[in-house]
A protein has these predicted regions:
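Charged, low-complexity surface patches
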Residues: 16, 37, 93
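Short, acidic loop-to-helix structural element flanking the phosphoryl-transfer center
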Residues: 7-33
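A metal-dependent, Asp-based hydrolase signature
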Residues: 1-5
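Asp-based, Mg2+/Mn2+-dependent phosphohydrolase catalytic module
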Residues: 25, 32, 40-41, 45-143
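Short, flexible loop segments at the rims of nucleotide/cofactor-binding pockets, characterized by
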Residues: 10-14, 38-39, 68
């Protein structure tokens, strides 16, 4: 059922997470931007095209296809290798503590967790930075 729904759903009919468009445009040009996702490649490419942001990303690594799923460190390392960036010089922004923060730490990256109203208690590992909105991603202290 899930596969049939995914195949029929228009993945390009998506909206920006608040602050995402601002963050991408603010970071573009000064930083190399990649994406590490556990999402289906076809769905993810439709979403990026629907938002008109595919050109912001120099590399997109799909966990479960190009490498093991996050939180495994391998998809992060694959993206970094393609970007030519050392882990200690990179930051990963994500909304899943389990996949994004744990994976970023396993790969040696700094982490920014989009809490989006969720409580920040008893998290292991503790994210390097916590933001409530992607509006906060375009500015210091983490860039």
């Amino acid at each position: 059922v899930a596969a049939a729904y995914g195949a029929e759903r228009d993945q390009s009919a998506v909206a920006f997470t608040p602050g995402a468009e601002r963050a991408l445009s603010a970071l573009d040009g000064d930083y190399r931007i990649g994406m590490v996702t556990n999402g289906d490649p076809g769905m993810q490419s439709q979403k990026l095209a629907g938002l008109g942001v595919e050109d912001y990303f120099e590399v997109v690594v799909h966990g479960g296809v190009d490498a093991p799923y996050k939180p495994n460190a391998e998809p992060f390392h694959l993206a970094l290798d393609e970007l030519g960036v050392a882990p200690e010089r990179a930051v990963h922004v994500g909304n899943s503590h389990e996949a994004d923060v744990v994976g970023a730490h396993a790969a040696g990256l700094r982490s920014v967790w989009l809490a989006d109203g969720r409580e920040v208690v008893d998290l292991d590992p503790v994210p390097h930075h916590v933001v409530e909105s992607l509006h906060d991603v375009a500015a210091e202290p983490w860039v």
